[in-house]
Amino acid sequence: MDNLYFLLNSFYLSKKSKVLPLLQRTILNSNMKTKQSLMMLLMIMFWITSALGQSTIPPSCFTDSHDITSLQAWGPYSKRYAGISHIPDMKAGMRFDFSVMPGYYRNRQLIPHVLFESSYYPWDINSSMSRITYRYEMEWKDRVFTDVTYYILDEHRTLVGMNCVNNTAVNQNLVLNLMAYIDYEEEQPQFKIPEDSNIQWHNATDYTSNEPVRKSPQYNLVYDGWNRNEMRTSQSLSGFVLGKGFGRDKGDKVNYEINILPGKEKGMIGFRYNTPKGKTSTFQVKGITESRLELQGTGEYNIVSIPYTCKEPGKYTLELISEGTHSTDLDGFFIGSEEDIKQIKILPRKLSFIPEIKSGKTKQDFILKYPECDNYYGIAWNYQESQIREVLDNNLESFFRKKTHDHVSSRLIGNREWHYSNAFLRPIVLAPHSEQTIYALVCTGTSQQVNEQIQKFHSTPETLTSLIQKDSNNSEDRILADGKKYEFGRRLLQSALLSNIVYPVHTQGQYIRHFTPGKNWNSLYTWDSGFIALGLIDVDITKAFECIRAYTTPVGSESAFIHHGTPLPIQMYAYYDLWNNTQSKEALQFLYPRLKQFFDFMTGKNPYSTTRMKGSGLLRTWDYFYNSGGWDDYPPQHALRDKASVTPVVTSAYYIRAAKILRLAAKELGFKKDVKEYEQTIKQLSNALQPYSWDKETG
């Protein structure tokens, strides 16, 4: 029997067919009764292999996107206040937020800010993120609280359950403030062209290639996955330009693919740019036209045009080659007729955060229409003692609290720098040891769709509440008896993990949803997100896969991977864990070449990587981030000593382990040449650590 257990365990751990010959020999050498048992065991193991080998990751996730595409348009994406968000258009960098803010009537008001402690907690979020609960603690511990649960019903609707609980021996008078508002990417373009314009616009950052003469260490690893020379500015029509020394050196060149439409075979190309006052940036233009482009500087954005002619409509190239006179900020270029280009109008774009508000007859709902958003949004609630208000201030945590005693005004006017549409439900009187659940509906769509959903909510609320279902894959069912005592803590950890996701984050020319180590870090973070992926593996395999994929790039990309922070190979650790947990050959194959590209760059095999130290062969990453080992409590070593000769041991050690992981994957995928390369790297780095990792001076 010991041999049987050994065989089963070996098979389960390896999932490799090489165990089968050993099992077959054991069957042949056994008596009939044992053979029957072993044959049954063999059938079970085949079933286990088949089940474990199936991909649990949807085919739609095997893309080049850096977004967590398996998420819904609704989710906890806000960078301001805890609640539910809706993304009307992933490309726009715009987000609609809705937050419930409980409090005591004319007394303490909770403002659940996501950036600091504010008496709310991510309480229970299921793995699919279709049910999101926050607890608002008004009197410690569990004496007076409100649990707000967002049930995502479909792409148009989220039902909100607000359970107010009084566990004290006296009456409690509570309030619920429902806040709706629009939010944007932090720096929005201040200018636009008319929507009915008869011209084509091309962003300068949408190039097919951008080749500077001087290749910096960041040539194949642009920070945050941005494009080369990409720079954010509100003066741009898109929010981003080619700047940061673009065109500074003679021979710098950028290429574009343009599409000439029928009837536009002859026209003008108008370049929008900003060159410093008194300077001129010049380029040779090739491709669709041969010309010399002079971008004379005024210190402001201007448009200069050159003619083009082509025989027929279709795709053409446009190449700009710098003459090295001076750098410029290139916003992009227009294509149109000579008359159209001459009449280009650049209009001011006012950031619109004040909606048109239409309240219902019962004053228990309102519909919002924001100028910059095509969607309508509707809010409805089933509590009669309520008032619809507007709050005009950008800091609710101070201004709104000051207005706690103003329970009469319909407009609370502060600095007018932001707008919140507010449903004020008050008072909610709770008898001793009682609770009350109030429901609200947040919906989106066309004006007609939103009106219909609101009417259904008021007329037949039970149809919505009946849609609330328990999770089909309840996590508690998967916990062993001895682990039940840890379930509360595990649930809170899962909720914290899944609530730390934000939108929008900009990378690779797109806005994405992104899991963060905390919403204070409103950015990418490479090694932190590797650890987040490790945690997600035990929560949701698909999200874990997408979290790893988000930091990889297709082979041959401008950036070897998405880099922010200390460049450690934690994505490779998550890759190994994902493989062990899923046995997904598809995931193994898809991620392997991307992670190999990551690994090759960090071990100095990319010709533009500067990680390999001359002489020792150890790895150092000072050119890519100040803190090579990721320590937050030590000063950066390169600032204290010569960065050319000092490097932390941990960097090389990390990539030895990464090499061992990728070697296993290469063996599984049959890449014999890669296996030899990894073995060589392991040997080189291991040998280098022995003589060069001891510092006599520091001991």
Language-model segments: residues:
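Bacterial Sec-dependent N-terminal signal peptides
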Residues: 1-54
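Short secondary-structure capping/junction motifs at helix and strand boundaries
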Residues: 35, 170-175, 582-592, 603-614
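Extended, well-ordered alpha-helical scaffold segments
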Residues: 452-470, 485-493, 540-553, 586-603, ...
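Substrate-binding groove/exosite segments of carbohydrate-active enzymes
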Residues: 417-420, 473-596, 603, 647, ...
